[in-house]
Amino acid sequence: MNTPSNRRKFLAATSAAIAATSLPGQALGRKDKQEIIDLHQHTNYSGRNDERLLRHQKAMGIKWTVLLPAGRKFGLGAICGGNKTVRRVVVKNPKNYVHFANEIADHPECIETIETYLKKGAVGIGEQKFRVDCDSKHIERIAELAQEYNVPVLMHFEHGNYNTGIERFNKVLEKFPKVNFIGHAQTWWGNIDKNHKQEVMYPKGKVTPSGISDRLLSDYPNMFGDMSAGSGQNALIRDEAHAVDFIKRHQDKLIYGSDCNDLIGRGPSC
């Protein structure tokens, strides 16, 4: 997809959360009442079991949830389930969930593992949250696989830790124009501000437009934003006047996600 499109077309055409071939038409909003898709959740997140996750999502009014696996044990930097776990939950609840595939980016079996689960029905790759540069050969190999299977890649950008070097990510977008990338996490959302200090994870105060993320969303049709977690929320509430303009400017590029690990699906912890 080389031209900007609305959120619904993005989901249908690129599987950027849900592949059109994987879900019935109503999941793409073809009913009178549009259904909510949550791009970003995890299984066994901080010990939350499958039943509680399902209740959590229903409490939030979510119809379809994208489950993001950790890859092999100790991957992702979060306590959550891996590829086998998300696959099992999707098979058990095919009317509530779809899943991505994932693996540690620089692991020798990364591509083989991800491809195994793409063949099983994964509709994307991620959440890529591993200690590599965002323009490394490892990410390029993942992008090549994503291009082959026509699926998106969800990237967790965190300065000093994961997918480092966001200022160079434009090179990846240019090299793989047919692959849709979804930006997420502290460094992605901090960089909506032109004056962002990279070491600050949750910046406060007024935002000056034209930060790195802002420009990537504007300049590259294959760059999208995942609004989930405290980082997405912080990007909006730190400067509400800017948030209004930002959403208007990028409304066809922003995707809802929760990424919360609470048990009830409402209140300040969610």
State the predicted function of each range:
Residues S46, S258-N261:
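Beta-strand-enriched cores of mature, soluble protein domains
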Residues V123-G124, S136-Y256, L263-G267:
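Catalytic pocket-lining loop regions of alpha/beta-barrel enzymes
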Residues F10-L11, L28-T85:
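An N-terminally biased module of ancient metal coordination in phosphate/nucleic-acid-related enzymes
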Residues I37-L39, V66-P69, F100-N102, G126, ...:
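Active-site neighborhood of phospho(di)ester-bond hydrolases with catalytic His/Asp-centered motifs
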Residues R72-K73, I79-T164, F224, A229:
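Active-site gating/metal-coordination segments in enzymes
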Residues M1-I18:
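N-terminal secretory signal peptides and thylakoid transit peptides that target proteins
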Residues P4, G47-E51, C80-N83, H107-I111, ...:
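Structural motif corresponding to alpha-helix initiation and N-cap regions
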Residues S22-P24:
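N-terminal signal peptide c-region/cleavage motif recognized by signal peptidases
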